[in-house]
Every structure is written in structure tokens, then in C-alpha cells.
Amino acid sequence: MRWPGNMERIVICLMVIFSGTVAHKSSSQGQDRLFIRLRQLIDIVDQLKNYVNDLDPEFLPAPEDVKRHCERSAFSCFQKVQLKSANNGDNEKIINILTKQLKRKLPATNTGRRQKHEVTCPSCDSYEKKPPKEYLERLKSLIQKMIHQHLS
């Protein structure tokens, strides 16, 4: 029996397995960043819902039933809206912080870069305007749809 030869094979096999694991992790890192960002957005929307009575009751464009491949376009419509506080005070500061967090860009994905056919998505102005409560519900629904598509 020759142990050193077997030991070399074991070490080589372990190195191959380890390098494959590292390569897989680095290739999926961008996708993980998107998933994490979408989960953060759900939390931000839930926090904003706590202040819905403090928001300016102005009607806002709120995409609904967004076509496939138009999710990011619809999300950017949500981001363009300026949620405003109806009164001054501590809640106004919190609302401003949360809306700034909503406006941060989503991480890029490989699927977005690979998409060659350009889908015609509706303009932001074409969406029905809704009060802040429904605006936030529709935003959360869109983010949940994006998470579901990301995981499938």
C-alpha cells in the first residue's frame, strides 16, 4: 500500500472541489446583491406604511400588472415619485430618509445586460394615479414579483 499517492489524490480532489465552490460563489454574487437589495426595499416600504397617515395625500403614479421584462422600468417610475410628508417634525425626517433609500439604484444583473430584444414598456405618466397607501402596496407587490422572478 502506498499512502503518499492516495494522500496526493485526496488533496488534489479537495482543491478541485474548493476552487469550484469559490468560482460558483463569485459568479452568483451579483445575483445575491440584487436579492438582498430587493429584501431591503420590502422592509423600507413596510416602514413607510407605518407613516402613511403622515404622507401628503397627493395621488401618485402607481404601476400595476406590470408586463414581463418591464419590472425595472416600472420600479424606476416608483423611484421618480417624490413622497412628501404632510407635516413637519420627526416623522418628516424619517420619511425623507426612507424615500432616499428607495431611490438607490438596483444592482446590475447579467440577465439585464444580455437582453437583446428591447421591450416597449409604458411611460411613467401612463400609469393610474393612486393615494400613498395604494402606491406603497403596489410598490411592494412589484418588488415581491421581482424577488419571485429572481428566485425562479
Swiss-Prot record:
Protein name per Swiss-Prot or TrEMBL: Interleukin-21
Entry's Gene Ontology BP terms: cellular response to virus; germinal center B cell differentiation; positive regulation of cytokine production; positive regulation of immunoglobulin production; positive regulation of natural killer cell mediated cytotoxicity; T follicular helper cell differentiation
Signal peptide: 1-23
Tissue: Expressed in spleen, but not in the brain, heart, kidney, liver, and lung.
Functional description taken from the UniProt entry: Cytokine with immunoregulatory activity. May promote the transition between innate and adaptive immunity. Induces the production of IgG(1) and IgG(3) in B-cells. Implicated in the generation and maintenance of T follicular helper (Tfh) cells and the formation of germinal-centers. Together with IL6, control the early generation of Tfh cells and are critical for an effective antibody response to acute viral infection. May play a role in proliferation and maturation of natural killer (NK) cells in synergy with IL15.
Alphabetized Pfam families for the sequence: IL15
Location of this chain's protein in the cell: Secreted
Cellular component GO terms, alphabetical: extracellular space
Principal place of residence: secreted
Keywords: Cytokine, Disulfide bond, Secreted, Signal
Family statement: Belongs to the IL-15/IL-21 family.
GO molecular function: cytokine activity; cytokine receptor binding
Species the sequence originates in: Bos taurus (Bovine)
Classification via InterPro entries: 4_helix_cytokine-like_core, IL-15/IL-21_fam
Gene that produces this protein: IL21
Paired cysteines (S-S): C70-C121, C77-C124
